[in-house]
């Protein structure tokens, strides 16, 4: 068993624009929110050990077993000492959209893992080159009925990305009483 100390960190900011601000005014929305979050994982000496990183063989602790059990679909590169990435979200809100009692909130989010591969599942799980984009819309009817629909596309990071073919659509409906 190998034990290494890990340092993780993140910094984020949220910007909320009101009706009279230029962004909502340009979009014709009532408000808009922009969220930025950047993070990192530092594990000194991680690249010196056969630590599994996130990826197709991430659940198999022995790198030789990972290569054998995944039929050679693996990468000999292990976790990196430093890995980092960022996330962005933008969502304008339209109260009483189209003259109805609905509030519509379209959104777009972006993920980009810039550098390094995080070790194991207990860290922030950065995978160098991974990108993800989501577009969606939320509908709120007088804070009683709510519905959401979104599509997520995951790409980048080549064969190291176990989720490259897992684009998905998500839908939900809820009622508050």
Positions of the model-derived regions?
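Membrane-embedded beta-strand positions in outer-membrane beta-barrel channels/transporters
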Residues: 10-12, 87-91, 132-136, 170-172
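Outer-membrane beta-barrel translocator domains and adjoining extracellular loop/strand segments
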Residues: 46-53, 116-125, 158-164
């Amino acid at each position: 068993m190998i034990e290494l100390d890990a340092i993780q960190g993140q910094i984020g900011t949220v910007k909320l624009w009101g009706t009279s601000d230029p962004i909502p005014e340009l979009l014709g929305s009532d408000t808009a929110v922009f969220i930025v979050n950047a993070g990192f994982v530092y594990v000194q000496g991680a690249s010196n050990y056969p630590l599994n990183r996130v990826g197709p063989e991430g659940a198999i602790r022995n790198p030789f077993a990972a290569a054998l059990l995944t039929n050679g679909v693996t990468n000999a590169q292990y976790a990196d000492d430093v890995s980092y990435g960022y996330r962005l979200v933008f969502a304008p809100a339209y109260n009483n959209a189209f003259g109805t009692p609905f509030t519509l909130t379209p959104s777009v989010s972006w993920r980009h893992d810039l550098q390094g591969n995080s070790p194991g599942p207990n860290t922030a799980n950065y995978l160098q080159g991974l990108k993800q984009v989501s577009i969606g819309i939320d509908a709120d009817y007088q804070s009683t009925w709510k519905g959401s629909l979104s599509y997520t596309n995951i790409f980048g990071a080549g064969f190291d990305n176990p989720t490259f073919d897992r684009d998905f659509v998500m839908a939900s409906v809820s009622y508050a009483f």
